[in-house]
Amino acid sequence: MSAFVVLGAQWGDEGKGKMTDYLAETADVVVRFQGGNNAGHTVVVGDKEYKLHLVPSGILYEDKINVLGNGVVIDPKALFEEINYLEDLGVKVTKEKLKVSDRAQLIMPYHRILDGLKEKARGKNDIGTTGKGIGPAYTDKAERSGIRVCDLMHKDVFEEKLRQNINDKNELIRLYGGEELDFDKIFEEYNAYADRMRPYVTDISVIIYDEMKKNKNVLFEGAQGSLLDIDYGTYPYVTSSSTVAGGVCTGAGVGPTAITGAVGIAKAYTTRVGKGPFPTELLDEMGEKLREKGHEYGVTTGRARRCGWLDLVILKSTARISGLTSFVVTKIDTLAGFDKIKVCTGYEFDGKVIDYFPASLEDLAKCKPVYEEFDGWDDSIADARSYEELPENAKIYLKKIEEFTDTKISIVSVGPKRDQTIVVGEI
């Protein structure tokens, strides 16, 4: 039995969808343990492209159990839109293939509305929310006023909790100048969701535990990236959940001793969507070249991603915090054609060089990246299928990542398709 965590090692958009899909081939269970439909990833199978936001990547296989854990916040409307989208593409989403935690929190219409109103009120200090209601849903969870999936399954309980929330939230919405919500309309809408959701709902911690006892392989699929973690990310420009490996324990009801490994997905350069610090960001033609070559536009928002050189300080931090057993390096094919390639190996801060990521945004703003320069390679590597086929300079680049982070590279991705994957060693 193996229980592996797959998580983003940067600010998200590292290629987790492709790699989770690839690794899911040998998994029996694929579990989402945090986040919501604010995440987006693309999986390419043959000539078909699937854009997923909430449903685990294992859904593309016929024989996998896919789990939305209690750490996920679920927008029923978004969930069923995604299920309809998948079924239109010929992917069956049955109650045997998809399991939804009865303890997961629901995203309600007032969460989405308040997300937008609060972001607008922040003005120039906005934090770049996707507007999906994720943050407000986690806020309600923390203050114990949230509505869970199990509440939705009991009409009278749901009615009472919804009425209280509508009363409270309408006061807030009025304060922000928004339009009040109608209880009856939402109650009717969500009761319809309850009927459709009921077959999928269960205690997912029991499902996962039972599968592990049968020596089944479990893959825990993270959303966003480690630098968006609520505690270890660039706060407040973060998401509202735990995106590091520790989030699996609370977000899926799994004990830490059950986890056998953690794999960090790292892009061969660095990108970020929205506001927040980004020490190696390139605001010149080089950054634009990376964006266009790498097609760096968000799956969920369509926003252009900010691009920059690879930051090894970030990867070293992620490896330490999540106890990574290996890295998967993606999109190294994008770097083909660059004469010189830089990587950040430290920050100049207050007259000295540091190799850690400061907690304070004010301190981080003072940090200037210290670069090491490498020779690039001209040849396209999209057709490479073994480590030996990679250009020598690409191998030197990858070796630097391993040495600096003290973490081996297990897989190198040279394109978006399943077969554009080079296995270097054991995960």
From Swiss-Prot:
| PROSITE patterns given in the database record | ADENYLOSUCCIN_SYN_1, ADENYLOSUCCIN_SYN_2
Which sites bind GTP? 12-18, 40-42, 305, 331-333, 413-415
According to its UniProt entry, this protein's organism is Clostridium novyi (strain NT)
This chain belongs to the protein called Adenylosuccinate synthetase
Please provide the record's keywords in A-Z order: Cytoplasm, GTP-binding, Ligase, Magnesium, Metal-binding, Nucleotide-binding, Purine biosynthesis
Task: Give each disulfide bond as a residue pair.
Answer: none
Binding-site list for IMP? 13-16, 38-41, 130, 144, 224, 239, 303
Instruction: Specify whether DNA-binding is a keyword of the entry.
Output: no
TM region(s), chain numbering: none
The listed locations are: Cytoplasm
Task: Give residues annotated as binding substrate.
Answer: 299-305
